[in-house]
């Protein structure tokens, strides 16, 4: 039977860290990978056969692969982050939160229904307010300390259409909202294929359009659509919407449909 130990102790045993203190610092900086995924806590149990790696300083070490998704969206939409107050709904380990901080966010509210997932380096950052055991549908300006200038969302096992009222309610009228649409949670269960993957491009288009139209009902218009550069863990292709209240940059109904189909055809 494989021996199990704390990941910080195992890093020292394998010579990947000089001490448990250094191991904890590496984990807090997002530089340790457990079977390819970011280590979140020094106390995480691993076996002596678990693949452990430490990212070198020459590589940009994000706390989760999700960071690469948001980087792609912010660059595609040319959204400025510096100096803005932000909400990260569905923060999990904090990939989106880290990207926002890296791009100069003044303040990030990291909200998640789970507990103890956010990386230590982010949890201890004075610019971050952590809201755990918090359902995104229950978010309010009062709960997050006032309205924000930028909302990002990476939510699972829930339809964005049901969460949008809370998200837009937390945003200032000048804000940008960038939610990640996951078709597997928007279409009916009977339309999800083997492994939980939505293969049909038409179903994916329908799910993105449904979220965009729900946003429009709430007074938020689609300015852009972009496929995430990384698929979800099961292989689902996911899509970012860029929402604003201003109508001068809004896509027309036909323009929105064209943008969605283009994002699907150009996506991974």
Curated annotation (Swiss-Prot):
GO cellular component: cytoplasm; extracellular region; host cell plasma membrane; membrane
Compartment annotation: Cytoplasm; Secreted, Cell wall; Host cell membrane
Deletion phenotype: Cells lacking this gene induce increased IL-12 and reduced IL-1beta and IL-10 cytokine responses, which sharply contrasts with the immune responses induced by wild-type M.tuberculosis. They are also more susceptible to autophagy in macrophages. Consequently, animals infected with the TlyA-deficient mutant M.tuberculosis organisms exhibit increased host-protective immune responses, reduced bacillary load, and increased survival compared with animals infected with wild-type M.tuberculosis. Disruption of this gene leads to capreomycin resistance.
Pfam families per the UniProt record, alphabetical: FtsJ, S4
UniProt catalytic activity: cytidine(1409) in 16S rRNA + S-adenosyl-L-methionine = 2'-O-methylcytidine(1409) in 16S rRNA + S-adenosyl-L-homocysteine + H(+); cytidine(1920) in 23S rRNA + S-adenosyl-L-methionine = 2'-O-methylcytidine(1920) in 23S rRNA + S-adenosyl-L-homocysteine + H(+)
Database matches in InterPro entries: Hemolysin_A/TlyA, RNA_MeTrfase_FtsJ_dom, S4_RNA-bd, S4_RNA-bd_sf, SAM-dependent_MTases_sf, TlyA
Alphabetical UniProt keywords: Cell wall, Cytolysis, Cytoplasm, Hemolysis, Host cell membrane, Host membrane, Membrane, Methyltransferase, Ribosome biogenesis, RNA-binding, rRNA processing, S-adenosyl-L-methionine, Secreted, Toxin, Transferase, Virulence
CDD domains recorded: AdoMet_MTases (cd02440), S4 (cd00165)
Domain S4 RNA-binding intervals: 5-67
The organism's place on the tree of life at top rank: Bacteria
NCBIfam families noted in UniProt: tly
SUBUNIT field: Can form oligomers on macrophage phagosomal membranes.
Family stated for the protein in its record: Belongs to the TlyA family.
Name the UniProt record assigns to this protein: 16S/23S rRNA (cytidine-2'-O)-methyltransferase TlyA
């Amino acid at each position: 039977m494989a021996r199990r130990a704390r990941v910080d102790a195992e890093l020292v045993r394998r010579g990947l860290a000089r001490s448990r203190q250094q191991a904890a610092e590496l984990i807090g900086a997002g530089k340790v990978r457990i079977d390819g995924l970011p280590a979140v806590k020094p106390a995480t149990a691993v076996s002596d056969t678990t693949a452990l790696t430490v990212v070198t300083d020459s590589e940009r070490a994000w706390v989760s692969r999700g960071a690469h998704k948001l980087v792609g969206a912010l660059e595609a939409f040319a959204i400025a982050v510096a100096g803005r107050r932000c909400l990260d709904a569905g923060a999990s380990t904090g990939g989106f939160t880290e990207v926002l901080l890296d791009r100069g966010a003044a303040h990030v509210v990291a909200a998640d229904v789970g507990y103890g997932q956010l990386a230590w380096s982010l949890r201890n950052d004075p610019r971050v307010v952590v809201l755990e055991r918090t359902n995104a549908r229950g978010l309010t300006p009062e709960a997050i300390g006032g309205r924000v200038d930028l909302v990002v969302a990476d939510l699972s096992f829930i339809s964005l259409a049901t969460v949008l009222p809370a998200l837009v309610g937390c945003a200032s009228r000048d804000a940008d909202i960038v939610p990640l649409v996951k078709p597997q949670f928007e279409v009916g269960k009977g339309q999800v294929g083997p492994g939980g993957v939505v293969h049909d491009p038409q179903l994916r288009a329908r799910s993105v359009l449904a979220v965009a139209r729900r946003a429009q009902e709430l007074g938020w218009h689609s300015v852009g659509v972009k496929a995430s550069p990384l698929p979800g863990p099961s292989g689902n292709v996911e899509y970012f919407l860029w929402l604003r209240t201003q109508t001068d940059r809004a896509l027309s109904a036909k323009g929105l449909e064209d943008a969605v189909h283009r994002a699907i055809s150009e996506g991974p």
